[in-house]
Amino acid sequence: MGKTLFDKLWNRHVIYGKEGEPQLLYVDLHLIHEVTSPQAFEGLRMENRPLRRPDKTFATMDHNVPTEDIFNIQDLVAKKQIEALQTNCAEFGVTLADMGSDRQGIVHMVGPETGLTQPGKVIVCGDSHTATHGAFGAIGFGIGSSEVEHVFATQTIWQQKPKSMGIEIKGKLPKGVYAKDIILHLIATYGVAFGTGYAVEYYGETIQNMSMEERMTICNMAIEGGAKMGMMAPDETTFEYVRGREYAPTDMEKAISDWKTLQTDPDAEYDLHIEMDASTLEPYVTWGTNPEMGVPFSRAFPEIKDMNYERAYEYMGLKPGQKAEQIELGYVFIGSCTNARLSDLEEAARIVKGNKVKNNIRALVVPGSRQVRNAAESIGLDKIFIAAGFEWREPGCSMCLGMNPDQVPDGVHCASTSNRNFEGRQGKGARTHLVSPAMAAAAAINGHFIDIRKEAVISGGN
């Protein structure tokens, strides 16, 4: 019987262990940031251990970075974590994309941009959205601080092999519908736990026709569907993305020859298989307090079916039967490792251009990396957003999570391009609605959610 992409990747990296039991995997790339690494570095120091492979470790600042003024860190804990990463990287010989450097940004954007993220690798990071890197035909998953220390010391990690799931996505995306809507649809349809215990491969004509940036959006939120990791087979789109980047292979053609073997064999079988027709999708909006609580734009919010729904409606200040356009928005956030890439900002700017943010909205655009910010400014996107009334910020995780100054006030609804809408995720009492960058941009200039498939409803002015 043939092998799946996941099987091939996993088998390449097993050092020790029997099938059905935890196995020791070799780690090709360890990405770190300021929040989950301090304890791990301290563990090495206490045991007088070296960091085994500094050359396979790469650090950046993202979670705690103030995006209004990156060097003005008021929070003492955040400042201490950032200073600790600087000290630790210098002591242990780890390359650091430091504050203000041309490579600094959200860790899951910096990896691909620098060419560190490549097909065939096992990539780990002390962050749950490491699944993003699976878009390149890699294994990527998040680990805890104790596991970060284990990788520091050994360049390996113990893991139980997940089962395999194949999600075949067919059809052309309708106008106004994006990769973000695909993953929101899957989670709303099958739930936040449907991927538990699985490594998910997304494939099919819809995926093949996507850019790498779109593919990363889908893999980024595999974890929100419960999966251990998400991945896609590498192809010419992947190879061209990696080619010429700072850490791309020296012998690119040799690498591509190997990467082309990283495909699921025709006679391979997944443990679970799902099919999806993307041609019938609508823009999605979440109404509740987990990504499963989402609906197509045309559909009303569902009836209360259990205590979780009842609590979600109470927290969000919404009722069954309402529709997305009735939500009284106060904030719009375009950013995060899900949707802060150049193509995301270009699509948002296309909608924003020539319009103005409504008076009831505070709108932020936070590029996910310095590279994206520089590229956006080189084509004038910053001017479009600023002219419309958006705040144009420095790169960082920003309003995706309440760990830095960018937070949504208590009780305020926010249209957000991030990946999680949990209670308090964007700040105490914040009410988060997950959408695509286009939906968020249109909401900013209309003051509420609109059906972006109907261009006539995009209006300017206050």
Curated annotation (Swiss-Prot):
Its EC number is 4.2.1.33. This is 3-isopropylmalate dehydratase large subunit. Belongs to the aconitase/IPM isomerase family. LeuC type 1 subfamily. Pathway: Amino-acid biosynthesis; L-leucine biosynthesis; L-leucine from 3-methyl-2-oxobutanoate: step 2/4. Catalyzes the isomerization between 2-isopropylmalate and 3-isopropylmalate, via the formation of 2-isopropylmaleate. The gene is leuC. The keyword Methyltransferase does not apply. Its cofactor is [4Fe-4S] cluster. It catalyses: (2R,3S)-3-isopropylmalate = (2S)-2-isopropylmalate. PANTHER family: 3-ISOPROPYLMALATE DEHYDRATASE, HOMOACONITASE, MITOCHONDRIAL-RELATED. GO terms for molecular function: 3-isopropylmalate dehydratase activity; 4 iron, 4 sulfur cluster binding; metal ion binding.
